[in-house]
């Protein structure tokens, strides 16, 4: 699944377009490697690091999701890891 689509499914961004713009302009990391393209592939087990407001989020992808569901369903797509 594309990174921007997963970020939208997991409800970190309100629209997929916002998620894509964020990935292009910000520093996201997948398993410690910098990513600049929103079409970067993600899979369960990968660790995603990105800044969201003043905080740095570090999450492990647990599932990809079939649709953008309600917030409780979105929280099942990832588990938060303490940031370094």
Show the residue positions of the predicted features.
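A basic, amphipathic helix-loop patch mediating RNA/tRNA/ribosome contacts
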Residues: 1-44
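C-terminal structural segments of small proteins and small subunits
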Residues: 54-84
């Amino acid at each position: 699944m594309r990174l921007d689509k997963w970020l939208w499914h997991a409800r970190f961004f309100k629209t997929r377009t916002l998620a894509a713009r964020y990935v292009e302009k910000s520093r996201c990391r997948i398993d410690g490697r910098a990513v600049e393209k929103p079409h970067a592939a993600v899979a369960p087990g990968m660790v995603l690091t990105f800044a969201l407001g003043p905080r740095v989020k570090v999450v492990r992808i647990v599932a990809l999701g079939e649709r953008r569901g309600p917030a409780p369903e979105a929280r099942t797509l990832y588990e938060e890891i303490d940031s370094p």
